[in-house]
Every structure is written in structure tokens, then in C-alpha cells.
């Protein structure tokens, strides 16, 4: 009986020590990870809407209305996570950055940042998070793919596998 109690005490002590160490490591790395993520997001914002001098997050975003808008356009598994206003030096809004999460990624969620000028021109897209398979899936994060969206002003993009022939067509990954 003493041996069982002794072993239980040793295992409990090891578990408590490991838990405390894990908590300390989490506490030490939490802020640097959050800062790195915020910096990465700011870099993506600047990349997709380079004319903006500053960005202001829209705090009162109606996520339900945004989800309905996406669903009505055939994007039922996507969600708008964040919208930021891109402002020039005088504080005027010159465009928007929209962060969208697609839940249809093969390797997990795909987070995309899209920059749109006030006149509706897509200035660029940037992948915030993508965990697709090496090769085909990761082609979405190449400049060749992302540059197809740059400076396009269309109502809706069409995807083609035969090569983009018009302004509203994007060469699909295949």
C-alpha cells in the first residue's frame, strides 16, 4: 500500500511541476506571439492596400450580416473576421482591408486579407494563414497567383483552368 501511495505522490508531483513549467512558458511566450501576429497582420494590411498610411479596425462589424452576404454569393463556409479602414495622411478613408477565413482548406482554415480601394478596385490579396499541402495547395501563396487579383475592378471574379482571357477571370490552381 505504501508503494502505491508513494508512486501516486511522485506522479502527482511530476504532473504539477510539468503543469507549472508549461504555464510559465505560456506566460513568457504569449505576448511575443501576439505581437508577432499583430505585426504580421499590419504588414499584410500594408501589402494589400499600400496607399494607406494607417488602418483603423471597424469595431462594430455586424458579423451576421457579413455572413449572410457571403452565403448569398455562394461562400457558405467563409466568414469575415475583420474589416479595417485604410486611411491616408489626412485621415480620409481610401479603402478597406477585409480579413476572411475559409473553412474549406485541406490542411485547415485559410485566412486571407483583401485590400479594396474605395472605388471597388481590388489592390491585392495576402495569405495570413495557410496550411495546405506542399506543391499544389501552397500555390495559392505564390506571387504569380496573388498578382492576378491586383488592380482588378470587377463585380465578381470567375475562375478558369484554361488561362485568364478577360479582366474578371482568374487562372485557377490545378
Question: Could you describe each region identified by the protein language model?
Answer:
Residues 2-174:
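Flexible, solvent-exposed loop/hinge segments and secondary-structure transition points
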Amino acid at each position: 500500500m505504501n508503494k502505491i501511495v508513494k508512486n501516486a505522490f511522485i506522479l502527482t508531483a511530476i504532473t504539477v511541476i510539468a503543469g507549472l513549467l508549461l504555464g510559465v512558458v505560456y506566460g513568457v511566450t504569449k505576448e511575443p506571439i501576439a505581437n508577432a501576429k499583430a505585426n504580421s497582420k499590419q504588414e499584410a494590411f500594408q501589402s494589400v492596400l499600400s496607399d494607406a498610411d494607417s488602418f483603423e479596425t471597424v469595431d462594430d462589424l455586424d458579423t451576421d450580416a457579413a455572413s449572410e452576404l457571403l452565403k448569398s454569393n455562394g461562400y457558405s463556409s467563409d466568414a469575415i473576421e475583420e474589416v479595417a479602414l485604410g486611411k491616408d495622411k489626412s485621415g480620409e478613408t481610401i479603402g478597406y482591408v477585409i480579413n476572411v477565413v475559409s473553412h474549406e482548406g485541406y490542411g485547415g482554415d485559410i485566412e486571407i486579407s483583401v485590400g479594396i480601394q474605395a472605388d471597388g478596385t481590388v489592390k491585392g490579396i495576402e495569405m495570413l494563414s495557410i496550411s495546405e499541402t506542399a506543391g499544389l495547395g501552397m500555390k495559392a501563396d505564390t506571387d504569380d497567383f496573388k498578382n492576378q487579383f491586383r488592380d482588378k475592378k470587377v463585380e465578381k471574379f470567375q475562375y478558369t483552368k484554361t488561362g485568364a482571357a478577360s479582366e474578371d477571370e482568374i487562372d485557377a490552381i490545378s
